[in-house]
Amino acid sequence: ECSVFLAKEGRGGAQQGLEIWDDYIFSCEDGGHVNIYDFKSADPKPVAGFELASSHPDNHVNNVCFGVETKRGASFPLLYITNGKVGSELEWLCFVESITRRGKRFSSEIAQTIELDGSKWVEKGYVPIFGAPSWLVDRERGFIWIFSARKRTVAKVTKHAWENQYVATKFRIPSLSEGAKVRLDENDILDQVVFPYEVWFTQAGCMHDGKIYFCFGVGKQDDNRPSCIRVYDTDRRTITARYNVQEQVIY
């Protein structure tokens, strides 16, 4: 069952990645602004806001996930920022930000930048991805997974489902002690799971204890790309749940 929990009032920017920690909802906009809402009261108006340190016209902030490590002096665990903009110089980067709260004021700094290098995956026997990696932190197990596909998931590139596959690739979560810049390549891959392609247009997702919960579609803009959720089990290596939320998406 799906129902509206909070009808947020934002600044008018395109809503993108969202995360929750304790009583705070961190709702990100394209470009890097973050609106913060009170989870307990579900007040539609933000209680605070700030700019990500990685704010940039090309930073789509497509997905955000809190990690397992907290930088000294910070108020929240590290936040992993997925760019998600195809063709951008930022496309293969994950900005790891540390957020500090002082009263009603929030601020953020880049604690680490992770670059994904997929240039030699095929040489090592792994399935390649087209780009736009979505960085998903599995806090329960302490790993980070990259979710993407062989080809772009828009209809003009993938015309038929059989042409494509979704790909989930497992890595360690780099610690801050590894430095300000870290590169993950084919030698860092711990596991890879390939899932059937049956829904178009990736949005964002999250992980919990080995399962990927991912959203797809564009709502009522296009009936051929309906809003839906899939649950991918990386242990069983299969899709374990399918949800259609087209009726609940008002746009």
Model-assigned labels for residue ranges:
Residues 2-8, 47-62, 103-130, 172-199, ...:
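Surface-exposed loop and turn segments in beta-propeller and other repeat-based domains
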Residues 3-33:
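Beta-strand-rich domains and repeat architectures in extracellular enzymes and scaffolds
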Residues 10-21, 60-77, 125-145, 150-151, ...:
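Structural signature of eukaryotic scaffold interfaces centered on beta-propeller domains
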Residues 32-34, 84-89, 150-155, 219-223:
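Short glycine/acidic-enriched loop and turn motifs that connect beta-strands
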Residues 42-85:
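Blade-loop segments of beta-propeller domains
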Residues 89-104, 157-177, 225-237:
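Beta-propeller blade signature
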Residues 191-240:
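Loop/turn-rich, solvent-exposed surfaces of beta-rich toroidal or solenoidal domains
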